[in-house]
């Protein structure tokens, strides 16, 4: 008992002693602290000096150094004969100026430093110490830096760290002794900076670690007091990783990073960044607990430099090192968001800040474009701030890929100038159809979906997500915030397939497809599926098919599947068995029905039958078709009829006994229903003899005909019975002499068809049918025969016929009383053969002739085109020339005008570029003052007009005098045997007269025009009353060759001249010898009085009376037509006059009172 109490007291004392020892240790702080060893009798101020130097000792670089060169005993480490000086070593933090724990010579010399030099009796030693646990949580590091940079440089400077692990302390009953410490060597650099590494097990991170430092230099040893630390409280994390910056959708700069790995607790982060732009320079330092930081008010063209470090969020810890600096520069145009991924039908918005030439563009001046091809309406713009513009797109359509671009480019522009940067808009149709079906055992549900209907994006993934409700589906499916993913696998048909197992039949599964992309995620419209409503039942079982006996219906039976328990409807398909079955469908809506009978056309065929089912209420899917069931061919009924048969009679015609061989063809299945086991022949003679003979399966039978009349019947018998409807054939001696066939003809169409026709005579016997029989006379082949209706008079026999062979055709009339006398021919009808042969030759010759004609015509056309191309390739089309506009090349007069050689000599002149008609500017002032002046008849016709009813006055006193008057309604007559209408030709001439001369020229026009035509309905008044006629001096010429009945058209110059040119040359040949064509000659002023007018035929000179006809004729240009200079006669040809079409070969040197530049011109009409 006493021993037990002693042990308890001892243990309690040891525990108190150990606690006391821990309380004597210095708790290591997360920040840096200092170890100072002070010589005895040193004051506090002296102790605060770095390295214990005197107050007046310093050097130029700021470091304190001793003024006394230390004299160490380098002979060894024997301290027995040396004087011993005790240094007091203690720890103090940078914030605390007092020593928190000193090392005295207590309990031995563990914390006592000894020196053998007088140098350390005047100075002290100081070290900076910082300890931390490395980010990988495996090494505890203490960093020891001497504050004397040169004190220990030339001596053996060593630092050791002594530590004791927690498990060692548990085994020791006393305060840790020197032998219980483990020692690690610290790696020191040349600058007296040492790093000590202590391995710490992961399981001991929360335990207390005891340490002390032992510093040796030469013969001096410094030892620190005990230090205690919990490694988990001294963790120094690794710097944050993945520093990244981007502009958010809201226009902020987002700084994001990742936490360092293997950190057992959350961290806080310190972010420092600087912004440098043309307008703002700022720095910031913020501490956050998240792994991101938003910086607002960013500006285009700015540079941001960012660094981040981390530290334990709750509890003590050490800041990590700063991360590597990251620089981010904004562009001159900032889009936020820069990219948008959205679905069809949604509304999205882009924001923009535009910087141009170091100035931010006001938001009101920003315009938006789509793909640089479509300007977005201003109604979609919004001004967010002075510099931020916003555009919104409504009800978006799917983006159409353009080559490798799968997005629309949205440009932010300043008026009409756009920056090359743009925002990207991705619009995807996410309408994905998800279909599910529950298997027939109600144990699993399979869902399928395809992405073929949506546009695929690079680096995008698709995932099916679902949410299961407790019971049924909601009326409007919606995406639930809590959902689960489902693994789906791509199948060979391009569909993804997902399997839900187990399932809850009455739970609603809401599903949607989520498209995950770096730009965001999109969800397809959700759909809700109830497994019980999408059941695909098992196919019906025990399906059988058969043809019922004596009824002849297709009977189909089946068994309902076990699941589901709902009422089912059934669908049956059946058809003739073969490679490609032509199915017929039949629906059965009676849930209790298990069989059905259907009519089929062919009772003797094999039918394939399949059945499937579905819920009667329409929910779910049709099951798969059952395995096919086949009918078995068997006799259903007795044969529908007996076989058709014919006979061959052999024997002496003089005798009454003949051998008759019956021939028949085997019955088909449709007639035998469905097989024939044997044939039976019934005999009936005129002596009432009746008997039957079984011939088995043979199709030939011979019997002896001895009676006057013998009737035979062939019956077909199957497993059901004998045929009911049978054919009878009576052999009668009297009837064999009845002849009703007058003629028989056989016409071969080709080698496979012969037409047989016949003519019958009237008969009192009832004709039943005909038998046509034919055979090749050159061969011993069998006789072929056909049964033909009695109403037919012509029949086509289809067989293989050889034209050079002879064939015998026989036609037998069959009566109720017996077989009549046949009509037999031994060859084809000759006349018809020749006709058909000639027709056949015609059939060959005509196509040959037609083909040859077509080939010859094609050859001629090709040759014509080649010849035309060869000879006329370089000849231009005259209709495309300006001088040929309006000319009718269908008339020979046109070509004579074009190509008759000019009789007068032509002088050379400068060549015009285009052969166009250039009218001359001639002013004409005409009047007849003397009414008594007489004018030749030819001149009368020259000035006659055609508007007799509207009052155009140019002529009075029929054929007696000519007078220009302003009176209206004067009658003009014109005698012409052919009543040919005169033709009025005129030309308008445009001048370049100066404005000062306009009045004079206009007066000339008015005086000349208005005196000849009435002011009311003149045919040329409209042309002269407007446009340039009132501004420039112009003139017109009239040539009379028009019928009196034609009304002169009211046209402008350009229209009227075209119309008149179309009528040019319409001079009937038969009237040329009766009527002359008159032309107006224009001459210069000097030759005006001697001017004459020549007719085409009479060659009579008709002088123009100057005072009565033309009072003034002035040529206003220096150049004019050749005939103006030399002669007033236009055309001296003995046949016909002509108008030159090439004005560049006509010159004129006539001098007038108005001289202008020399020009080529032509006065033609």
Curated annotation (Swiss-Prot):
Its main location: membrane. This is Leptin receptor. One of its GO terms (molecular function) is transmembrane signaling receptor activity. GO terms for cellular component: basolateral plasma membrane; external side of plasma membrane; extracellular region; receptor complex. Receptor for hormone LEP/leptin. On ligand binding, mediates LEP central and peripheral effects through the activation of different signaling pathways such as JAK2/STAT3 and MAPK cascade/FOS. In the hypothalamus, LEP acts as an appetite-regulating factor that induces a decrease in food intake and an increase in energy consumption by inducing anorexinogenic factors and suppressing orexigenic neuropeptides, also regulates bone mass and secretion of hypothalamo-pituitary-adrenal hormones. Present as a mixture of monomers and dimers. The phosphorylated receptor binds a number of SH2 domain-containing proteins such as JAK2, STAT3, PTPN11, and SOCS3. Interaction with SOCS3 inhibits JAK/STAT signaling and MAPK cascade. Disulfide bonds join 37-90, 89-99, 131-142, 186-196, 188-193, 352-412, 413-418, 436-447, 473-528, 488-498. The gene is LEPR. Belongs to the type I cytokine receptor family. Type 2 subfamily. InterPro entries: FN3_dom, FN3_sf, Hematopoietin_rcpt_Gp130_CS, Hempt_rcpt_S_F1_CS, Ig-like_dom, Ig-like_fold, IgC2-like_lig-bd, LEP-R_IGD. It comes from Homo sapiens. Pfam families: fn3, Lep_receptor_Ig, ObR_Ig. On ligand binding, phosphorylated on two conserved C-terminal tyrosine residues (isoform B only) by JAK2. Tyr-986 is required for complete binding and activation of PTPN11, ERK/FOS activation,for interaction with SOCS3 and SOCS3 mediated inhibition of leptin signaling. Phosphorylation on Tyr-1141 is required for STAT3 binding/activation. Phosphorylation of Tyr-1079 has a more accessory role.
